[in-house]
């Protein structure tokens, strides 16, 4: 599977107990230059010893430690001599297992809270302000710290907000230092990682590239690899990385289903094939896809048709490539976490490659499976992929097919494609393109009366969707300046045929999703 050998890097592992913030723990540590993975809480002490981490973090979670079905940890872990930091549920679990008391709180704490540092010399809190705000999310609390622990911070509703056992290097915080809403949370994590664990910041993207290229060469040998290229960031970076490792032994199949953004297919071919030398077979299948989608209005049915047709087209082309033993995919670490931990729900398969390895008998190569999205973008730039391609907007697998509400027709696709291009152009001109997390146009499927010149019109409305977010889990609508919105509106109505009204979506996520379908 072209998995990188991580023995060369200092590691801090996080055990997953189900917190919505658990991915942030590993993200923060990697930002410090320390390699980190989120692993199952079911790992045994022997398995952890084999990993040889510099430190262990117990994540937060939704359970109560005194519940018989609560997530537990191998008690032998506490005997390994490895520093441990418990966060929220993790602090409660460590306290409970080591003889402390955990009870239901009289007043739960969710959101911002103020804590007071009780010990100015506490390892994780030394030199930080005595009063600071943090992010709490708990309904239980530690009411008695275990023997050997000192209480180092308190809050109004949580008398034991932080604990420390310096002899065993066990620490706990009831709040979430991994969340940016905790004022000095990153400082606390840094102190645990560097001062307590003694980890070195030796996780670099250059090392990752060299080691991953070596791993790919060893695994593939003289065999051939095929890759389903969507034109998105993940598959593009995967393609260039594998190409650097094995050259023309890689063949990418780029299925243009006619649902891409304006000029997107040409941009991908120019950047990857012409400029970087990646071997790409481009299949123009727009008529085929649109024929299958004719008359279909249900969004889930549209997704299934697009996914099924993609697999069939890919399958037809893949069979033409002789001696191909491997299929490459742009799986990221977030996908691995979401589908592979005991506490997570299974995610949907990617529409264009789900089932292909089994269907065609390929071995799987996933060279990005250890990377987060931002690391993938960094890797892409180091590999020489153009900045605008690496930092392009998130785009759904079914493409514009789910930005046309109702039946998809060539006319409707053209309206969305052209209006979206105008929106992206004006947002970039205004310098907002890296400030707004995602922005696009949608054809909601409604028509309205309008007046153009001296005549009455009955044409389509176009909706603009623009959101700010960190990770896409939650989002707020972007406050685009009115003059910019006006310019976008005027251009779309004047330059795109059959449009006489522009709508601006001012809904957050939740209750809405970012995409309409």
From Swiss-Prot:
InterPro entries: Class_I_gatase-like (IPR029062), GATASE (IPR017926), GMP_synth_C (IPR001674), GMP_synth_GATase (IPR004739), GMP_synthase (IPR022955), GMPS_ATP_PPase_dom (IPR025777), NAD/GMP_synthase (IPR022310), Rossmann-like_a/b/a_fold (IPR014729)
EC number: 6.3.5.2
Gene Ontology molecular functions: ATP binding; GMP synthase activity
TM segment ranges: none
Domain GMPS ATP-PPase residues, every copy: 203-392
The keyword Ligase appears for this protein: yes
Binding site for ATP: 230-236
Catalytic activity: XMP + L-glutamine + ATP + H2O = GMP + L-glutamate + AMP + diphosphate + 2 H(+)
SUPFAM superfamilies given in the database record: Adenine nucleotide alpha hydrolases-like (SSF52402), Class I glutamine amidotransferase-like (SSF52317), GMP synthetase C-terminal dimerisation domain (SSF54810)
Domain of life of the native organism: Bacteria
Keywords of this entry: ATP-binding, Glutamine amidotransferase, GMP biosynthesis, Ligase, Nucleotide-binding, Purine biosynthesis
Alphabetized Gene3D superfamilies for the sequence: 3.30.300.10, 3.40.50.880, HUPs (3.40.50.620)
Keyword Nucleotidyltransferase included in the entry's annotation: no
Pathway: Purine metabolism; GMP biosynthesis; GMP from XMP (L-Gln route): step 1/1
UniProt-annotated catalytic positions: 88, 176, 178
GO CC term, one of those recorded: cytosol
Residue ranges constituting the Glutamine amidotransferase type-1 domain according to the UniProt record: 11-202
Role this protein plays: Catalyzes the synthesis of GMP from XMP.
Assembly and interaction partners: Homodimer.
Family matches, as PANTHER family: GMP SYNTHASE [GLUTAMINE-HYDROLYZING], GMP SYNTHASE-RELATED
HAMAP family listed in its UniProt record: GMP_synthase
Name the record gives this protein: GMP synthase [glutamine-hydrolyzing]
Protein's gene: guaA
């Amino acid at each position: 599977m072209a998995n990188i050998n991580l023995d060369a890097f200092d590691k801090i592992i996080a055990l997953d107990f189900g917190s919505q913030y658990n991915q942030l723990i590993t993200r923060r540590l990697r930002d410090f230059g320390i390699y980190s993975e989120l692993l199952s809480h079911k790992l045994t002490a022997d398995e952890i010893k084999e990993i040889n981490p510099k430190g262990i973090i117990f994540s937060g979670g939704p359970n109560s430690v005194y519940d018989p079905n609560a997530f537990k940890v191998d008690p032998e872990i506490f005997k390994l001599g490895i520093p441990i930091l418990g966060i929220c549920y993790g602090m409660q679990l460590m306290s409970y297992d080591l003889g402390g008391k955990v009870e239901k709180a009289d007043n739960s704490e969710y959101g911002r809270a103020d804590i007071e540092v009780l010990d100015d010399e506490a390892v994780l809190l030394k030199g930080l302000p005595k009063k600071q705000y943090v992010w709490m999310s708990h309904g239980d609390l530690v009411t008695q710290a275990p023997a050997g622990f000192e209480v180092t911070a308190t809050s109004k509703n949580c008398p034991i907000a932080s604990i420390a056992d310096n002899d065993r290097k066990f620490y706990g915080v009831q709040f979430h230092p991994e969340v940016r809403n905790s004022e000095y949370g990153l400082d606390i994590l840094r102190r645990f990682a560097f001062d307590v664990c003694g980890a070195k910041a030796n996780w670099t993207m250059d090392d990752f590239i060299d080691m991953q290229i070596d791993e790919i060469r060893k695994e593939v040998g003289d065999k051939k690899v095929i890759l389903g290229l969507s034109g998105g960031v993940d598959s593009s970076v995967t393609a260039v990385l594998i190409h650097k490792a094995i050259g023309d032994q890689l063949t990418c199949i780029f299925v243009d289903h006619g649902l891409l953004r304006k000029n997107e297919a040409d941009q991908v071919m120019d950047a990857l094939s012409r400029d970087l030398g990646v071997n790409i077979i481009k299949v123009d299948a727009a008529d085929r896809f649109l024929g299958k989608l004719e008359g279909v209005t249900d969004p889930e049915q549209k997704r299934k048709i697009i996914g099924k047709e993609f697999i069939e087209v890919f399958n037809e082309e893949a069979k033409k490539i002789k001696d191909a033993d491997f299929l490459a995919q742009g799986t990221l670490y977030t996908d691995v976490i979401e589908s592979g931990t005991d506490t997570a729900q299974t995610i949907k398969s990617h529409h264009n490659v789900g089932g292909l390895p089994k269907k065609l008998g390929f071995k799987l190569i996933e060279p990005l499976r250890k990377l987060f999205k931002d690391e993938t973008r960094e890797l892409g730039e180091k590999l020489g992929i153009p900045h605008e391609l690496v930092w392009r907007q998130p785009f759904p697998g079914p493409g514009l097919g789910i930005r046309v509400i109702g039946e998809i027709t060539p006319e409707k696709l053209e309206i969305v494609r052209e209006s979206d291009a105008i929106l992206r152009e004006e947002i970039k001109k205004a310098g907002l393109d890296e400030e707004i997390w995602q922005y696009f146009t949608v054809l909601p499927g409604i028509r309205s009366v309008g007046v153009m010149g001296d005549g009455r019109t009955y044409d389509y409305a176009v909706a603009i969707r623009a959101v700010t977010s960190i990770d896409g889990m939650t989002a707020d609508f972007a406050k685009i300046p009115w003059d910019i919105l006006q310019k976008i509106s005027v251009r779309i109505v004047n330059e795109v045929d059959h449009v006489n009204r522009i709508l601006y979506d001012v809904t957050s996520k939740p209750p809405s999703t970012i995409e309409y379908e």
